[in-house]
Amino acid sequence: MKSSLRFLGQELVVEGVIPADNAFNEAVYDEFIKIFGTDKKFGIFPSENFSKPEQTESIFQGVVTGKFESEAPVKIEVYIEDSLVASVAAFISFRK
């Protein structure tokens, strides 16, 4: 199984975990620090699902918990202190 996050033209893949696992979160955080810098805070939030907008939250939860083998659109928000400085479109995915 593998979990991945695609954003800014690159893909971060972590083998053997679901997106909700600490190992995936730590890898994502380390990648964000490399790209955005150490003085930032980050948040990942579900974006509206393109084909089934009414199921956005359940699809996101299913992918993150490894129940759905799929991908979900998300947005990455980047903050300095409490100010939003960037919002980046991305996809989080899970494959068995």
Curated annotation (Swiss-Prot):
UniProt superkingdom: Viruses
InterPro entries: DUF5498
Pfam families on file: DUF5498
Name of the protein in its database record: Uncharacterized 10.7 kDa protein in Gp54-alt intergenic region
The gene coding this protein: y12A
